[in-house]
Regions:
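Short connector loops at secondary-structure junctions
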Residues: 88-107, 203, 242
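Structural helix-boundary/capping segments
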Residues: 1-69, 79-91, 158-185, 230-274
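Short glycine-/acidic-enriched loop or helix-start segments at secondary-structure transitions
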Residues: 70-71, 104, 169, 207-210, ...
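Short low-complexity, flexible loop/linker segments enriched in glycine and/or proline
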Residues: 106-112, 214-215, 251-253
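Short, hydrophobic/amphipathic alpha-helical patches that form generic packing surfaces
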Residues: 105-114, 156-164
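Short glycine/serine-rich loop/turn segments
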Residues: 1-11, 64, 113, 199-216
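Serine-dependent amide/ester hydrolase catalytic core
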Residues: 100, 123-230
Length: 274
């Protein structure tokens, strides 16, 4: 694993089902004295908790927000997900996340800024790819980073360096951090009444490779998954529904250190049984 945006990064598990994800989470959780991001807390038995019948759930819904995007397929799939919760006799409650739509611009200021700092270590000397046939030290830096980083990575480094540069720090990075706090506060308030929040995973189905050339259009697919990273919250995504023969997904966001409850509701939803 390579640090990209330290305040946003979290390890993700790809699994066939929630139970397998719970088992994997059990293995990677816990305190590590060499990992500054780990905490000294007892690790629950996630694999047992995800199948437990002892959890009481109240799922937060943002139906009006989903409808505001004007995508009928998105609204329809979200509505069908709500119907599944009702069939499972799981309580739901409409909540407000007034700043959620600001997640995208906030993320694309904070993430590149932290990325530009984290990836500065990859200079071809101690870390990362080292170019050959160089004339001097400056040429080594230039060629190693030029050849070693991909186009998207270079783009984000440039954006991040710009946001952190003199005269722009307050206008962009500092302001983005303030809005991030508002987004986090929205979730803190929501979790006073609910145990998890249900959102679509993406705003649409996966697009064909090369079919979208505008990077902003591709970035928009992240609008529902970014809030969890901004708030430092655990989240899961399970397959649900389809569009144009491509799978769609439903996401559950849990409260801080409430992975057991999150895995439990996600498992119930995925199984679709009482």
């Amino acid at each position: 694993m390579i640090a990209f945006a330290s305040s946003l990064d979290q390890g993700g598990i790809l699994a066939k089902n929630i139970k397998d994800a719970a088992i994997a989470l059990q293995c990677i959780s816990g305190y590590d004295s060499k990992d500054a991001t780990s905490i000294k807390a007892e690790v629950p038995n996630f694999s047992e908790d995800c199948e437990s019948s002892e959890f009481e759930h109240v799922v937060g819904l943002v139906t009006d927000l989903i409808h505001s995007f004007g995508d009928e397929d998105l609204s329809k799939n979200y509505g069908e997900a709500i119907e599944r919760l009702e069939k499972l006799k799981i309580k739901t409650k409409e909540i407000e996340l007034p700043n959620l739509e600001l997640s995208l611009p906030v993320y694309y200021v904070i993430a590149p800024a932290e990325c530009s700092a984290n990836l500065s270590r990859y200079d071809g000397i101690r870390f990362g790819y080292r170019a050959e046939n160089v004339e001097n030290l400056e040429d080594l830096y230039f060629k190693s980073r030029g050849e070693g980083f991909g186009k998207e990575t270079k783009k984000r480094i440039l954006i991040g360096t710009y946001c952190l540069s003199s005269g722009f720090y307050d206008a962009y990075y500092k302001k983005a951090q303030k809005i991030r706090n508002l987004i986090s506060s929205d979730f803190v308030n929501a979790f006073k009444d609910v145990t998890s929040v249900m959102l679509p995973t993406t705003s649409g189905e996966a697009f064909d490779l090369g079919s979208i050339t505008d990077p902003v259009e591709m970035y928009k697919q992240d609008i529902f998954t970014i809030p969890a990273n901004l708030g430092g919250l655990p989240a899961t995504s399970v397959p649900f529904g389809e569009k144009n023969n491509m799978p769609l997904g439903i996401q559950f966001i849990g409260n801080i250190l409430e992975e057991s409850s999150l895995l439990n509701i996600s498992n119930k939803f995925q199984l679709g049984e009482k």
